[in-house]
Amino acid sequence: MKKICWILCFCCFMTFWNAKTSVSYAKEGQVFTYTVNQQALLKFLNSSSNEYNNTMKQGITLAEFASKKGIDEAKLIHYFAIEQKTQLDIALNKGEIDPQMYQDLLPDIHHSIYRTIHYNPNSK
């Protein structure tokens, strides 16, 4: 019984911790959303809009699609990191986010890009 109680307490603690940490760096009203420049991405991938959309509908991830186009994962991550950093810089300069939020978001860029390029909601 004690083990179950400790496990439940630990699970509750972890749930609370994870729910709290994802927004703890953001002050009220601060939101940063990365917006993909679709035309620039298609140019980088050397792809047409139809080819890209059809591939995504088939459940292929962006990393797999880029690989078929001869672009390795590191280049793809670097491309998105530069794009996101540029948008973060603009948001900081416009006052949409503060320096603390900017500094808190930077370390997670590569990890979030990695998750994104390896995810496709249409995959089986």
Label the model's feature ranges.
Residues 3-14, 18-124:
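Mature extracytoplasmic/periplasmic regions of secreted or cell-envelope proteins
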